Amino acid sequence: MQKLEQVYEGKAKKVYSTEDPGLVIVSYKDDATAFDGLKKGTITGKGAINNQMTNYLMGQLEKAGVPTHFVEELSERETVVKKVTIVPLEVIIRNISAGSFAKRYGVEEGIVFDAPTIEFSYKNDDLHDPLINDYHAVALKLATWDEIDTIKKYAFQVNDFLKKTLAECGVTLVDFKLEFGKTADGTIVLADEISPDTCRFWDSKTGEKLDKDRFRRDLGNVEGAYQEMARRLLGK
């Protein structure tokens, strides 16, 4: 697969076109940002870990019945994926109160919910990704009702799979963010990544944070947390 021109660069990844119009190459960076880009830094080795963790989990999710954009891992940092049109919604699943949820509603972190919650935010940098509901999403023509229903179904399937998989590694899945895309024929697939950048992982016994919160909150040992997640999940 030949990497051609760069067609996009985001906070954590670059995307390149290929000779196949239906495929692109994603290259993961070590750059880290938080608080809507106000805090910036580098987490050494993060790109490679996020790439390999995402590919492993998406491969397993495909087997579990959740379609994804994953095609083939090229190298430790680069992966071939299906070219999709991203649905401009961030889908947040929460199993335990933490982060912005705890702050927004004035509750302590660590409250285990009776059932997972789902939130949507509108992917719009100028508006700082505001929270919206499914009625807003349909009214703004960000997605149809059928697409929203499909996205919700897949998001909860991902949650069930990740909770079980991570529990076997001694990790509690607190919350996480997903993004979905549409292929050329309109099929909804899981896109973006599943990694310590997009999930909150707590050690099941100690509660130690094993994710980007260590960067956000200046907790130290950021690289070590990413490496520990790779060790537990990937055996690396």
Range-by-range predicted roles:
Residues G45, I49-M53, D146-Y154, V158, ...:
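Short amphipathic alpha-helical segments
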